[in-house]
């Protein structure tokens, strides 16, 4: 008998209830108890929804107040000293101080670093390790939630992040040492947790070790053997992998004293005959056959045919999602503004639970394809011929691309001289990354415009006033290169998608990016093209308000691709080129209108990197080409900027050089300029702006702090190529936080200029 399960469920709530409650708590508008009540309501609802849709094993432990990696740090008592508020008591406010640098109680401090969760747009809080790190069971959240779910009568499957993946994701702070040395210290905490779970008579524990998709050093493989031998005997462990194939680590996995393994069949290509022969017969095999990272309906007929024989060969088989459903919206039923034809192609979290149940029942009860799964899968096949999907003009334009379309006219050194003459910027030029605060009145005006409560002219007048205000503030601050503030944009990807052909949009398709930050990714359903200019009028208007240069602000092709739900019938390379051609037209329109600086943001470049080293060069090749296709049509005098944030840059630095952007701005402040260590050996040839303060924390940086970071940067980057800027856009900050932070940033730059 086949069972089904999910690896995790979205936390935020259908209407972002968790986000609302978090932000009210942070601003002291509700109590901790009220926040806890919202969390419990969401958990109870989500467990019940999965149960009603036929899910056998309900995941518990997937809920988090900010991030599940941070939750693991809390459980282990791994809290940086600066966040402890003078004692060892681990509380909810401790968690928020680690994540944000500030909480309703305790002193404000620097937040812990944040970076991307493998190859997704979800961010986790990076664990910090030191030689003096100590661990003890300190956070009962998962046990309390298990008790909640058991009391409600659910068949519970606890979800915990495995010890090796936890250590891999962390960073050593201070004196360098091998963080694997901490494994013996954290295993007793895992043993205690597993014993507590065992006492509750729970049959299976999902222990996530996604680093098994990587090509691990031998010492890490040995650490797996040691760790899981130590954890043997407590519970039936379902070793869970996702985001890729682990076939290269099968020998290691099969050595481990575990009772089952979960494999991602969506993102890892496995031969089922090989699986059956290789994996021990007594083990449970869980097959991730429903895509947890994308919103397309599953071809259940295909999966039925593929799994039918395999299901009869295995004594114990589960089917599940490829990964946690954290990465997809909750319910498709609310999306009434999408045409019925297009909507029939999609499947959100609740619909994916339906898919698992339909397929489970068909495999358990039938030897042939059932009518239920045939009807479910039919729209997948009709979509292939839909006129909505295909555009002949786009296909023809792709064929006309030549090698010259990927090249600037001259090398950077020549361009820099022309740009200096054209722009006349001071040394250590100051700028921001693009967005300014999206206040409640801006969000209301956008909502009213979409609902028809105000007309186009009223909305444009409103946005124009905010742009004017932003320009005035920047001029008062003395910033050198200005931005228009992006007040007309709801999201850096969604906005461009709304103005390109080939996209559709949801009303309630929210997914968590980090903490309370949620995004509503566009869905790429067809060939992409641009019908008319997107950002031109707003940038032109902003430039009329000042004699200083105003940057044209665009989101890059790779980021639009990766931060959308992408179609699966076409390669990412081709889709990215389609987007790049549309953006190339936008870039040339901006240049023709007199815009001297154009920023094309690519924060997702690193995110798209395949987990396997052997596959990375191919991805980086087409990703770089897509950026260059969008940016290389301009003349030498036009300065191209790009921005990247919250990722590990070192392993893509060669690709960043190949982008050939005149200026790159990057996140470095949360890691105390740690990234710049790389520049000791690697001489980045173009201009660079390492972020000098963390915009994801409400803390206002001091002039001295910013000067310290800039002095550090000067050790690695020639001052003539150094820019001064925040880490990222300022959309989520208040105007007071923004103004005073930028004021200190500009003052720091001016003080240092005088000393040079």
Swiss-Prot record:
**Top-rank EC class of the record's enzyme:** transferase
List the active-site residues. Answer: 696
Which cofactors, if any, are listed as required? Answer: Zn(2+)
Record-linked Pfam families: Meth_synt_1, Meth_synt_2
Query: Record's InterPro entries?
Result: Cbl-indep_Met_Synth_N, Cobalamin-indep_Met_synthase, Met_Synth_C/arc, UROD/MetE-like_sf
Q: What are the UniProt keywords, alphabetically?
A: Amino-acid biosynthesis, Metal-binding, Methionine biosynthesis, Methyltransferase, Repeat, Transferase, Zinc
Reaction catalysis annotation: 5-methyltetrahydropteroyltri-L-glutamate + L-homocysteine = tetrahydropteroyltri-L-glutamate + L-methionine
Where on this chain does 5-methyltetrahydropteroyltri-L-glutamate bind? 16-19, 116, 517-518, 563, 607
Named in its record, the pathway it takes part in is: Amino-acid biosynthesis; L-methionine biosynthesis via de novo pathway; L-methionine from L-homocysteine (MetE route): step 1/1
Q: Name one GO molecular function term.
A: 5-methyltetrahydropteroyltriglutamate-homocysteine S-methyltransferase activity
Binding of L-methionine, residues = 433-435, 486, 601
Residues binding Zn(2+) are 643, 645, 667, 728
According to the record, cofactor stoichiometry and binding are noted as: Binds 1 zinc ion per subunit.
Role according to the record: Catalyzes the transfer of a methyl group from 5-methyltetrahydrofolate to homocysteine resulting in methionine formation.
Please give the family membership noted in the entry: Belongs to the vitamin-B12 independent methionine synthase family.
Q: What is the name of the protein in this document?
A: 5-methyltetrahydropteroyltriglutamate--homocysteine methyltransferase
Provenance organism = Buchnera aphidicola subsp. Baizongia pistaciae (strain Bp)
Annotated gene = metE
């Amino acid at each position: 008998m086949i069972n089904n399960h999910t690896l995790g469920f979205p936390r935020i709530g259908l209407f972002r209830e968790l986000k609302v409650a978090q932000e009210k708590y942070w601003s002291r508008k509700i109590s901790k108890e009220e926040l806890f009540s919202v969390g419990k309501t969401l958990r109870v609802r989500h467990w019940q929804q999965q149960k009603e849709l036929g899910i056998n094993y309900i995941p518990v432990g997937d809920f988090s107040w900010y991030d599940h990696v941070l939750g693991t740090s809390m459980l282990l008592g791994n809290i940086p000293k600066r966040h402890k508020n003078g004692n060892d008591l681990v509380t909810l406010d401790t968690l928020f101080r680690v994540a944000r640098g500030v909480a309703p109680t305790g002193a404000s401090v620097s937040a812990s670093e944040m970076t991307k969760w493998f190859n997704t747009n979800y961010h986790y809080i990076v664990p910090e390790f030191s030689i003096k790190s100590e661990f003890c069971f300190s956070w009962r959240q998962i046990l309390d939630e298990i008790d909640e779910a058991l009391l409600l009568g659910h068949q519970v499957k606890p979800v915990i992040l495995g010890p090796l993946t936890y250590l891999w994701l962390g960073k050593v702070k201070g004196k360098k040492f091998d963080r694997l040395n901490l494994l013996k210290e954290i295993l007793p905490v895992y043993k205690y947790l597993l014993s507590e779970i065992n006492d509750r008579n729970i049959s299976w524990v999902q222990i996530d070790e996604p680093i098994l998709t990587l090509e691990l050093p031998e010492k890490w493989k040995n650490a797996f053997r040691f760790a899981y031998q130590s954890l043997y005997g407590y519970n039936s462990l379902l070793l869970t992998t996702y985001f890729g194939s682990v076939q290269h680590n099968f020998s290691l996995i099969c050595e481990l004293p575990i009772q089952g393994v979960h494999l991602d069949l969506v993102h890892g290509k496995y031969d089922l005959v090989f699986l059956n022969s290789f994996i021990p017969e007594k083990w449970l095999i869980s097959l991730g056959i429903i895509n947890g990272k994308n919103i397309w309906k599953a071809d259940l007929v295909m999966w039925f045919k593929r799994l039918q024989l395999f299901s009869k060969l295995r004594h114990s088989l589960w089917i599940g999602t490829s990964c946690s459903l954290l990465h997809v919206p909750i319910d498709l039923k609310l999306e009434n503004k999408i045409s019925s034809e297009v909507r029939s192609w999609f499947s959100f979290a609740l619909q994916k639970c339906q898919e698992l149940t339909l397929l489970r029942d068909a495999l358990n009860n039938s030897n042939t394809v059932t009518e239920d799964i045939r009807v479910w899968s039919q729209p997948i096949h009709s979509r292939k011929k839909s006129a909505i999907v295909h555009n002949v003009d786009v296909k023809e334009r792709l064929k006309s691309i030549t090698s010259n379309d990927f090249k600037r006219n001259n090398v950077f050194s020549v361009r820099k001289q022309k740009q200096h003459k054209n722009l006349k910027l001071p040394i250590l030029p100051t700028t921001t990354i693009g967005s300014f605060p999206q206040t409640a009145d801006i969000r209301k005006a956008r909502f009213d415009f979409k609902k028809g409560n105000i007309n186009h002219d009223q909305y444009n007048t409103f946005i124009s006033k905010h742009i004017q205000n932003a320009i005035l503030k920047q001029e008062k601050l003395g910033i050198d290169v200005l931005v228009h503030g992006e007040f007309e944009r709801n999201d850096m990807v969604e906005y461009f998608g709304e103005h390109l052909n080939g996209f559709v949009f949801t009303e309630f398709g929210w997914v968590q990016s980090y903490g309370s930050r949620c995004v509503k990714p566009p869905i790429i359903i067809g060939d992409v093209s641009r019908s008319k200019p997107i950002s031109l009028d707003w940038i032109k208007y902003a430039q009329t308000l000042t004699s200083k240069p105003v940057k044209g602000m665009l989101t890059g092709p790779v980021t639009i691709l990766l931060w959308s739900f992408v179609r699966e019938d076409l390669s990412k390379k081709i889709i990215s080129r389609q987007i790049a051609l549309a953006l190339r037209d936008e870039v040339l329109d901006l240049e023709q209108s007199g815009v001297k600086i154009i920023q094309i943001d690519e924060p997702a470049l690193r995110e798209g990197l395949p987990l396997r080293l052997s596959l990375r060069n191919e991805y980086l090749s087409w990703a770089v080409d897509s950026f260059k296709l969008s940016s290389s049509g301009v003349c030498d005098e036009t300065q191209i900027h790009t921005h990247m944030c919250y990722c590990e840059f070192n392993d893509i630095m060669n690709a960043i050089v190949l982008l050939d952007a005149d200026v790159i701005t990057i996140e470095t402040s949360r890691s105390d300029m740690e990234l710049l260590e790389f520049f000791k050996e690697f001489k980045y040839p173009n201009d660079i702006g390492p972020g000098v303060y963390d915009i994801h924390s409400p803390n206002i940086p001091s002039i001295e702090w910013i000067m310290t970071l800039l002095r550090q940067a000067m050790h690695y980057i020639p001052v003539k190529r150094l820019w001064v800027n925040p880490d990222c856009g300022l959309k989520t900050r208040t105007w007071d936080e923004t103004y005073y932070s930028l004021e200190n940033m500009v003052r720091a730059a001016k003080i240092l200029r005088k000393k040079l």
